[in-house]
Regions:
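Active-site-adjacent structural segments surrounding the nucleophilic cysteine of cysteine proteases
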Residues: 4-5, 11, 15-80, 122-123, ...
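Noncatalytic regulatory segments and standalone regulatory/sensor domains
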Residues: 19-22, 129, 135-136, 145-212
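Extracytoplasmic/secreted envelope proteins and their assembly/folding machinery
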Residues: 47-55, 65-69, 81-85, 103, ...
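Structured segments of extracytoplasmic/periplasmic soluble domains
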Residues: 53-61, 71, 87-94, 109-113, ...
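Mid-chain, structured segments of secreted extracytoplasmic proteins
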Residues: 74-104
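Active-site-adjacent substructure of cysteine-protease-like catalytic cores
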Residues: 99-158, 164
């Protein structure tokens, strides 16, 4: 997965108002998963940063992003879905990826307590010149935190100041990517990495603890 160095905030700003009058403003649902907000350290480490947030959420890891680069096989061209699955399993989590995932399947995963990492397109330089459906050079990993009837909400590692959102129809247009594998180019569609652990965070930020 290729990662641009220009960081683009999904949905214009972290949970800011929609621009057009009459459009319902996105509001983070009360049942949103309290996934920790992690900022990726470079343009190609969004996969490792997304996994880091998930590991923190399941309370199985206390290290940093750089400690996951080897486990996930992250290189200058990014992280593969297989690498994210491998990294999650290395820390005792159940993980797998799947293509052609539906919105209903995402909702079922969230309702069942799973964390989900999506592989989408982001950061368009000139979005008016090429529709999302034709873009594959701007792959980016985000962690799904909630869904409602109009929006998907994410922990986006390119942001770092709050959660982000995308309208569901737009998500369906952006939800694809490609990977250069040894066997050739793999064009994936609606790919998601599903991760489950035993001890999820109850809230974020967590309760106060004394400084050691």
């Amino acid at each position: 997965m290729r990662k641009g160095l220009v960081l683009f905030i999904l949905g214009a700003a972290a949970l800011s108002a929609c621009g057009r009058a009459g459009t319902r403003q996105p509001v983070l649902p009360r049942n949103a998963l309290p996934v920790p907000i992690i900022r990726q350290s470079s343009g190609h480490t969004c996969g490792a940063a997304a996994l880091l947030a998930v590991l923190y959420y399941w309370q199985v890891y206390e290290g940093n992003e750089s400690g996951l680069l080897g486990a996930t096989g992250t290189a200058v061209d990014g992280t593969t879905p297989q690498g994210i699955v491998k990294g999650a399993r290395e820390y005792g989590l159940a993980a797998y990826y799947k293509e052609m995932v539906t919105i209903d399947a995402l909702q079922a995963a969230l309702s069942g307590g799973e964390t989900v990492i999506l592989d989408i397109q982001a950061w368009p330089d000139k979005p008016e010149e090429m529709p999302w459906a034709k873009r594959r050079e701007d792959g980016h990993y985000v962690v799904l935190t909630a869904l409602d009837k109009e929006y998907a909400y994410f922990m986006d590692p390119s942001v770092g100041t709050g959660y982000t959102y995308i309208k569901l129809p737009e998500l369906m247009e952006r939800w694809h990517d490609y990977e250069n594998l040894k066997g050739g180019v793999w064009n994936n569609e609606r790919l998601a990495v599903f991760v489950r652990g035993k001890t999820p965070m109850k809230e974020y930020p967590a309760a106060l603890t004394p400084t050691q």
